[in-house]
């Protein structure tokens, strides 16, 4: 009975595969939104002020960072929790694929969130005259919370790796 339960539990990981397919559809939606924004920028390029252009470009950078985050989560999550990805033609394979464990993925996600938040905060500061002070304070507090969380996660991973190395040295 125990073996049947274990086999079922192990195979149940495939129930999560549609989530990664859904995230890849989210990547498609993000790509469409990116080109929609480009379509809105290009015809008006000469009418836009420098500040407006920079704000719109920051928005595109935001979309690109979110897209990169999605790709990381889709590939790493699929490979860590579902199955190894057998990509034919090693030239095409991403160098980090298969090398990122759940802990590293969490840290990369946290760093990406900080980068996205930084870009957004830069956009807020460029449009400062239209942002109420109390809202600005919350943007900064939220950003600092992301930065602090990413720092703590990185520090904890460093401690964890150091502890694992010490345990291996003591056993070997």
From Swiss-Prot:
Source organism superkingdom? Bacteria
Q: Where in the cell is it found?
A: Cell membrane
What parts of the sequence cross the membrane? 15-35, 57-77, 108-128, 136-156
Q: How does it sit in the membrane?
A: Multi-pass membrane protein
Q: Which Pfam families match?
A: UPF0114
Keywords associated with the record: Cell membrane, Membrane, Transmembrane, Transmembrane helix
GO terms for CC? plasma membrane
- Does the record's keyword annotation contain GTP-binding? no
> Where is this chain primarily localised?
membrane
The record's section on PANTHER family has: UPF0114 PROTEIN YQHA (PTHR38596:SF1)
Family label: Belongs to the UPF0114 family.
Protein's name in the database: UPF0114 protein PMI3225
Name the source organism: Proteus mirabilis (strain HI4320)
């Amino acid at each position: 009975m125990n073996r049947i339960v274990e086999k079922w539990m192990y195979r149940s990981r495939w129930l999560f595969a549609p989530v990664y397919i859904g995230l890849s559809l989210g990547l498609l939606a993000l790509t469409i939104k990116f080109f929609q924004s480009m379509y809105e920028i290009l015809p008006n390029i000469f009418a836009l002020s420098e500040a407006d252009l920079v704000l719109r470009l920051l928005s595109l950078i935001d979309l690109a960072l979110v897209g990169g985050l999605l790709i990381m989560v889709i590939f790493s999550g699929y490979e860590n929790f579902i199955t190894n990805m057998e990509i034919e033609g090693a030239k095409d394979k991403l160098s980090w694929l298969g090398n990122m464990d759940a802990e590293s993925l969490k840290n990369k996600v946290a760093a990406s969130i900080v980068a996205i938040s930084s870009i957004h905060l830069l956009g807020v500061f460029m449009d400062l005259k239209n942002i109420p002070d109390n809202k600005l304070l919350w943007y900064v507090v939220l950003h600092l919370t992301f930065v602090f969380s990413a720092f703590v996660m990185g520090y904890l991973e460093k401690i964890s790796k150091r502890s694992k190395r010490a345990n291996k040295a003591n056993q070997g």
